């Protein structure tokens, strides 16, 4: 992209943008929630649409001059409904957290009981963490993973639901590497008369391409971000049954947001169009293949994988047997050009600022073109770095740079 105007107007920011570009180009990005957008998505984000205020919804705006952005939003809504087979879509949420908040406000009252996945077992802040608005406003009861299998025990979820009678059951996760059984969760919700919301922020790309079962036939509400496996701009979206559309829309605007970001909604529309192409399914298939190969390679070096593997795009690694914390592993690997994040593991004994594990994802490196052989090399580099953490890391930096040079960012 051309940054001539930025360089003229603000050298400091232009310099930092260039530095970040170089960091991305010369690093192996393994953060499971990150990806690289297409140039088309980036151009939409930087378009004239950023100038337009458009409170309200298409044909029901509080400002004039919205006829063009109405078409943009309509395109985004229709494309995402087609992508997921949904009855209604709202593409205005600025983030996944705000998408979840809008759903809660649509059907809950403060103090209502909700069943959600424990953050330390792979859930998300907005699924009831006490430090988040969700845990502060509502009475969340947490379910986790089974101590032995490290996967969701649906019978335990059923028992909790029967005991606590939640008004809403929240499914989905930010660090769970296995298939989620939405049909069974729907059955549990029906047993206790609860709504079902599924947060597919991490697996949206897999759901869209049929590589993970879709929650849309079972859930009352489905929320997501657009910037992880969907490979779009940073933002959120909500899908729901038509009967909830009116309540949902008014809880986005005027409920928790004012004007939508029309340049981001345009970029969302572009990413939905890209996701409808056959090439996107090919991409997502490679994401999953890469995750499987990387997981197997890490296991061959003695790394303990939570639930012993992965069905999706991410791997949760328990480093307890490697004599290193998640925090120290993150810092160590960052120093050689591999970016990932420390992460709690089931039955965590350390602080969330230290952790016993790391989370690894393959969407971003797959976008660059990395395939199975590169996964084996990445696993080897990670193993060598942790094994030689107090030694000379320069040869490992060179191996990272060699991989990055083979697959340019853009």
Swiss-Prot record:
Plays an important role in substrate specificity, annotated site positions: 227
Q: What is its EC number?
A: 2.1.2.1
Which GO molecular function annotation, any one, does this entry have? Answer: pyridoxal phosphate binding
What this protein needs as a cofactor is:
pyridoxal 5'-phosphate
**InterPro entries to which the protein is assigned, alphabetical:** PyrdxlP-dep_Trfase, PyrdxlP-dep_Trfase_major, PyrdxlP-dep_Trfase_small, Ser_HO-MeTrfase, Ser_HO-MeTrfase-like, Ser_HO-MeTrfase_PLP_BS, SHMT-like_dom
Q: Which residues form a coiled coil?
A: none
Q: Where in the cell is it found?
A: Cytoplasm
Catalytically driven reaction(s): (6R)-5,10-methylene-5,6,7,8-tetrahydrofolate + glycine + H2O = (6S)-5,6,7,8-tetrahydrofolate + L-serine
| Pathway info | One-carbon metabolism; tetrahydrofolate interconversion; Amino-acid biosynthesis; glycine biosynthesis; glycine from L-serine: step 1/1
Q: Which UniProt keywords apply?
A: Amino-acid biosynthesis, Cytoplasm, One-carbon metabolism, Pyridoxal phosphate, Transferase
Q: Which GO terms describe its biological process?
A: glycine biosynthetic process from serine; tetrahydrofolate interconversion
Annotated positions of the N6-(pyridoxal phosphate)lysine modification? 228
- Do the record's keywords include Cytoplasm? yes
Q: What does this protein do?
A: Catalyzes the reversible interconversion of serine and glycine with tetrahydrofolate (THF) serving as the one-carbon carrier. This reaction serves as the major source of one-carbon groups required for the biosynthesis of purines, thymidylate, methionine, and other important biomolecules. Also exhibits THF-independent aldolase activity toward beta-hydroxyamino acids, producing glycine and aldehydes, via a retro-aldol mechanism.
The record's listing under PANTHER family reads: SERINE HYDROXYMETHYLTRANSFERASE, SERINE HYDROXYMETHYLTRANSFERASE 1
Q: What is this protein called?
A: Serine hydroxymethyltransferase
- Please tell me the species this chain comes from: Clostridium perfringens (strain ATCC 13124 / DSM 756 / JCM 1290 / NCIMB 6125 / NCTC 8237 / Type A)
The beginning of the lineage is: Bacteria, Bacillati, Bacillota, Clostridia, Eubacteriales
- What gene name is given for the protein in this entry? glyA
């Amino acid at each position: 992209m051309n940054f001539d105007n930025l360089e003229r107007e603000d050298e400091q920011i232009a310099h930092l943008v260039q530095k970040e570009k170089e960091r991305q180009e010369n690093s192996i990005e393994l953060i499971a929630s990150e990806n690289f957008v297409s140039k088309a998505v980036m151009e939409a984000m930087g378009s004239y649409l950023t100038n337009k205020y458009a409170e309200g919804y298409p044909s029901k705006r509080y400002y004039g001059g919205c006829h063009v952005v109405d078409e943009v939003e309509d395109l985004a809504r229709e494309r995402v409904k087609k992508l997921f087979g949904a009855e209604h879509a709202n593409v205005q949420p600025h983030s996944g957290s705000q998408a979840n908040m809008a759903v809660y406000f649509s059907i809950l009252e403060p103090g209502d009981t909700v069943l959600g996945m424990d953050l330390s077992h792979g859930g998300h802040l907005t699924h009831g963490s006490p430090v988040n608005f969700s845990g502060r406003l509502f009475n969340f009861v947490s379910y986790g993973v089974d101590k032995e299998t490290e996967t969701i025990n649906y019978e335990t979820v059923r028992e909790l639901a029967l005991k606590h009678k939640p008004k809403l059951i929240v499914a989905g996760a930010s660090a769970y590497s296995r298939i989620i059984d939405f049909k069974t969760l729907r059955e549990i919700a029906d047993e206790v008369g609860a709504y079902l919301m599924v947060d597919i922020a991490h697996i949206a790309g897999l759901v869209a391409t049929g590589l993970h079962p879709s929650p849309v036939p079972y859930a009352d509400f489905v929320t997501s971000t657009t910037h992880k496996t969907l490979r779009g701009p940073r933002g959120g979206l909500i899908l729901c049954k038509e009967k909830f559309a009116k309540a949902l829309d008014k809880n986005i605007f005027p409920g928790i947001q004012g004007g939508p970001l029309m340049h981001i909604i345009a970029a969302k529309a572009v990413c939905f169009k890209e996701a409808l192409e056959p090439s996107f399914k090919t991409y997502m298939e490679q994401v999953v293949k890469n995750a499987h190969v990387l997981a197997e390679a890490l296991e061959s070096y003695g790394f303990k994988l939570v639930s012993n593997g992965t069905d999706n795009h991410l791997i949760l690694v328990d480093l307890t047997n490697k004599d290193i914390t998640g925090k120290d592993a993150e810092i160590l690997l960052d120093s050689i050009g591999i970016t990932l994040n420390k992460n709690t593991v089931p039955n965590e004994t350390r602080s969330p600022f230290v952790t016993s594990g790391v989370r690894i994802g393959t969407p971003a490196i797959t976008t660059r073109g990395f395939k199975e052989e590169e996964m084996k090399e990445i696993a080897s580099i990670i193993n060598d770095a942790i094994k030689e953490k107090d030694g000379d890391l320069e040869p490992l930096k060179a191996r990272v740079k060699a991989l990055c040079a083979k697959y340019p960012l853009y």
